[in-house]
Design a protein with these regions (language model features):
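ATP-dependent helicase/translocase motor core
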Residues: 1-198, 202, 206-214
Length: 214
């Protein structure tokens, strides 16, 4: 098989947490090892314990940047209590809505095929043109909103209104882009297109610019 993801899994009962998993990637894993090389082997790296999950798409030593990959709890961070198991069991078992977990085959193939993409940003430094590349992997809330809205539109057709809330810096542009692409190619059970076109309207210049580059 192909190595598409790595996981550092920690257990609080042995005195380690997700923070130890993050540090292990930073200090104990050689970023030049083939499996950890950016764009070469694994596409995403998860730091996980029984309660929380974080992920990154680029291991870069102390410059490694982690993003939360949690369900959210009581309109805040983290994961809710799971009476049937670990708080992070949504990764390998079932989601709260009963759908298959994030790491199950069909779910992960959907992420790779319909979410994951390489973002290339052109910039200039000291008069020299450069490129910054980033692998964009959806955070949990982005993945869920795209999947749920798409499924509802497939089942109920066009004409419904939705209120989707994102906090500042949580990836609104990517969520909008992913959902727009899915809806534009969405068909019903008779293979008829549900939407003739998808139009994105925004009242913020910054968001408008971000969307054009997404």
């Amino acid at each position: 098989g192909l190595p598409i993801a790595t996981v550092e899994l920690k257990n609080q009962f042995s005195g380690q947490s997700v923070e130890n998993a993050k540090k292990q990637y930073v200090y104990d894993r050689e970023p030049n090892e083939p499996i950890f090389l950016f764009k070469k082997r694994a596409l995403v790296h998860f730091a996980v314990d029984a309660d929380e999950c974080y992920m990154t798409t680029k291991l870069d030593g102390k410059r490694t940047r982690y993003l939360p990959f949690n369900l959210g709890s009581n309109n805040g961070a983290g994961n809710p209590l799971n009476k049937l198991g670990y708080r992070t069991s949504y990764l390998w078992d079932k989601l709260p809505d009963g759908n298959d977990g994030v790491w199950t085959k069909d779910s992960f193939m959907d992420i790779i095929g319909k979410f994951l993409h390489l973002s290339v940003e052109d910039f200039e430094l000291n008069g020299i043109k450069k490129k910054k590349e980033s692998i964009i992997f959806p955070r949990f809330h982005q993945m869920q909103v795209v999947r749920k809205a798409t499924e509802d539109a497939r089942n109920n057709g066009a004409g419904k209104n939705y209120l989707i809330q994102h906090s500042a810096g949580s990836g609104k542009s990517n969520s909008i882009a992913w959902l727009s692409y899915r809806l534009s190619s969405l068909h019903d059970d008779t293979n008829k297109r549900i939407f003739d076109s998808v139009i994105v309207i925004t009242d913020r210049k910054v968001l408008d610019s971000q969307l054009q580059n997404t």
